Every structure is written in C-alpha cells, then in structure tokens.
Regions:
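Ser/Thr-rich, low-complexity intrinsically disordered terminal regions
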Residues: 21-143
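C-terminal motif of bacterial Sec signal peptides marking the signal peptidase cleavage site
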Residues: 16-19
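Soluble catalytic regions of membrane-associated enzymes that act on cell-envelope
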Residues: 13
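Bacterial N-terminal signal peptides that target proteins for export
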Residues: 1-9
C-alpha cells in the first residue's frame, strides 16, 4: 500500500500538472535519512532546511511529523537551466527522544520546452537540494 507521503506527493504533482499546462514531471524518488536527534529537533531541522531552500510549504502537520512543499522556479532563470525546475517534496519525520528518521519523497517538474534537458538538469537539481537538506538534518561531525 502506498505511504501517506507518496499519495500526497502524487496528488500535489497532479494538481501542479493538471492546473498548469505545459509541464513535465520526473519520477518520484524516495529516500530515508537517519537523524541523530529527537523527533522534535529533526522536525525543526527539516523546516529550517526547507525554508533555507526557499520551499513554499503546502502542508505543515507537526503533530504527525509531515511536511509537504514546493520550491518554485526563479522568475528570471533561463529556460534549460536548473533555476527553471520545480522541486516537489513530501517529508515524514518519525522517531523518539534520542533518534529520528526522515523519509523523503521528491520529484522535479519543469516546463514542457525543457523536456529534452529536464531529466538531466532537473534531476541533478533535485539531488543537490536533497543533499543540502540532508546536511541540515544530519550535519557532519565537527572537525
């Protein structure tokens, strides 16, 4: 059975694609990140990371540890560049007072005119955004 975050991400992507003609979307990609912090701290880190990455939050449900958001493209980005890619994300935070797990489901959405470049350009942008979010969730040890 699909997870709640997968269903919400699919509905959000469908709304984006159905409400806006001329868009293409990449596949949904799921990932899990262990966080060496309490569930509440992991949720705060997730929100901070999403704010830093300029995500517009669509759903914020802290009682269930669920966040859904979209990072919209830059208004002045050139067609064919990563700045024209949307990143759609759904995050579920689970854990206890000592450790947490953040399950993330992401996909890219791009203008139809980028259909030839989007699988490479936008997927790289999606991966880069997720890498930066993971650094906020579980920072490397201080040297």
């Amino acid at each position: 059975m699909p997870s709640r975050s997968s269903l919400l991400l699919a509905l959000l992507a469908a709304a984006l694609l159905g409400g806006c003609t001329g868009l293409v979307a990449g596949p949904e990609v799921a990932a899990t990140t262990p966080v060496p912090a309490s569930r509440d701290s992991a949720l705060a880190r997730a929100r901070r990371g999403l704010t830093t990455e300029s995500f517009t939050m669509d759903i914020v449900d802290p009682s269930h540890g669920h966040l859904t958001g979209t990072r919209y493209p830059s208004s002045n980005a050139q067609l064919g560049t990563s700045g024209r890619c949307r990143v759609v994300l759904s995050m579920d935070v689970a854990g206890d007072a000592s450790a947490s797990t953040v399950s993330t489901s992401t996909r890219w959405v791009a203008p139809e005119q980028m259909a030839d470049k989007a699988p490479e350009v936008c997927d790289q942008e999606r991966r880069d955004v997720l890498d930066r979010l993971n650094l906020v969730l579980a920072p490397p040890p201080a040297q």
